[in-house]
Amino acid sequence: MKRSEKSSTSVVSNNKQQDVNIISSNEVGVKEENKGHQEFLLKVLILSVIYVLAFSTRLFSVLRYESVIHEFDPYFNYRSTIYLVQEGFYNFLNWFDERAWYPLGRIVGGTIYPGLMATASLVHWSLNSLNITVNIRNVCVLLSPWFASNTAMVTYKFAKEVKDTQTGLVAAAMIAIVPGYISRSVAGSFDNEGIAIFALIFTYYCWIKSVNTGSLMWAAICSLAYFYMASAWGGYVFIINLIPLHAFFLLLTGRYSHRLYIAYSTMFVIGTILSMQITFISFQPVQSSEHLAAIGIFGLLQLYAGLSWVKSHLTNEAFKKLQRLTVLFVLSCAAAVLVVGTLTGYISPFNGRFYSLLDPTYARDHIPIIASVSEHQPTTWASYFFDLHILVFLFPAGLYFCFQKLTDANIFLILYGVTSIYFSGVMVRLMLVLAPVACILAAVAVSATLTTYMKKLKAPSSPSDANNSKESGGVMVAVLTVLLILYAFHCTWVTSEAYSSPSIVLSAKQNDGSRVIFDDFREAYRWIGQNTADDARIMSWWDYGYQLSAMANRTVLVDNNTWNNSHIAQVGKAFASTEEDAYIQMKALDVDYVLVIFGGLTGYSSDDINKFLWMVRIGGSCDPNIKEQDYLTNGQYRIDKGASPTMLNSLMYKLSYYRFSEVHTDYQRPTGFDRVRNVEIGNKNFDLTYLEEAFTSVHWLVRVYKVKDFDNRA
């Protein structure tokens, strides 16, 4: 009886214990579920804040000035978007612009990447379809900030795929405000790069996803992302070379897999076919030297996969013999195709900009028109810190953590980082390509460091070194926190002061901190549009061609497309010649008005006098009589009394300094004192014979001259 009572008691106690265990396990499950919900909500909140931050931090220019298009190239994009919205896509692709490159004109549809215009017009159409009436200008102004927010989200997914969620959140926060990317994505910067960086990161994310999963769907999405990138920016060549490089390194390191084969073969075939639908690209993916690496890696993967299959059906000796013969045959065929294609002209050589990336001195020595563009200059060390701040130091740390654990994704990140750091050093414009990977690698370093030291703060290894661990962990976390706060302050300051000023509206700060606005450009363009004939031809340096076409709606001789070097050289030659010789050239080109930018009164350093030597160099590339040495004095570029006679009598000098001797720029200086060059001009007393002043803006920034008609007696 007692035994039965004991046994029943033990059964009851066991049941109670099981119930307690079930309850405790359920409680643990509920807690974990609640924790998962909390983490999800926190992640959504952080990403929402980042999304809003990425958009709002780019609105300084709109708040400070107004909704206005920035820089030079965006004005052509804006004008083209208006044409696309009004005329439709078919007419846009067949648009011949008779107001550009007089008397040649320009076939627009076949000479541009239409992705930006198509995106803006699609957004405009979508909003108006929803009865949200929005002006196309506002769509163009705000498109880049919106895509910057989308880029932050894609960067989160990319970094998460490479490492983990924490890294993704840090990377998204960093790229939301990094100056290197903001420089091309502020409100009003309606340029190709504004949407292209989103397409770039999205393509890379889809590529890593397809390599990790071997999914045909992700490879197809990667192809679509690549197609969008190809439609938006010429930087798509970076993608179609980096992805093959990644595949090649995976082969070299013995990481070949069916996942890689599926991802690359699908992406290359579909992506190439789609990119060839862009009129400007056409057959370049199968003809140009820039795409040969992608074709070669595609063939190499097919060969490797085929040999791997054959190997399972042959003996080792037979396979080695077949392998040698196959490799020899393929190399011979590839060399023959390369030689024949190059000799027959089927395979086109590298273009000038691509050569400049491989050889930084190439453009300077052979193509001055490329070297004259400021964004094509090599990057200084100061620019790296200015555009990246602490990312400069976290970048190598991120590479170190990637090397510690080599995966397919980490190898891609390493290759992306190393190649982009090289190209950004060659051309300052490509800082834009470096900024995203710098943020991701910095996020890898920050995330790994914080994870390590936060563990020390929470759980010391033993009581003996608990204090040391907590102290070192606390110091490291505090240092990183301070650095990230400084990064945020620096990014905000750079965005506000350096990258939120439209070139068409200038401003300066007075001693009391208030701003003075110089709206001379729009004033001049409005005057030209209202006071000149509709068919008037305007000659200016190519920098201002797009703005003249969009703002004044007048015909220009050259513009920022710079597709015809000899035509630009004719304009450069005219500005470098004497007034009499230039008059003959201008009449031959049917020029009605000449526009020059002059900053001597206001201190605007980006005026035509400072650009004049580039006009001389480019003009001299087509006329050997134009020599740079003739415009220098003992190797120095001067505009004072010590300037060379050739310089003092050039058309550019006379148009810039005409009547400047009547102006006092400073009470302590003589008349005709140039505030940019900080000298008194050398030639004051001269008149114009063949041109007459038509308009000078309030601050003398823009000067317009009318070309006189021929004297009948002549």
Swiss-Prot record:
Q: Which UniProt keywords apply?
A: Endoplasmic reticulum, Glycoprotein, Glycosyltransferase, Magnesium, Manganese, Membrane, Metal-binding, Transferase, Transmembrane, Transmembrane helix
Residues binding Mn(2+) are: D73, D191, E193
Show the domain comment: Despite low primary sequence conservation between eukaryotic catalytic subunits and bacterial and archaeal single subunit OSTs (ssOST), structural comparison revealed several common motifs at spatially equivalent positions, like the DXD motif 1 on the external loop 1 and the DXD motif 2 on the external loop 2 involved in binding of the metal ion cofactor and the carboxamide group of the acceptor asparagine, the conserved Glu residue of the TIXE/SVSE motif on the external loop 5 involved in catalysis, as well as the WWDYG and the DK/MI motifs in the globular domain that define the binding pocket for the +2 Ser/Thr of the acceptor sequon.
Q: Which residues lie on this side of the membrane: Lumenal?
A: 61-143, 183-193, 231-235, 284-291, 348-380, 427-430, 490-714
Entry protein name? Dolichyl-diphosphooligosaccharide--protein glycosyltransferase subunit STT3
Source taxon at top rank: Eukaryota
Q: Which residues are glycosylated?
A: N553, N560, N564
Q: Which organism is it from?
A: Dictyostelium discoideum (Social amoeba)
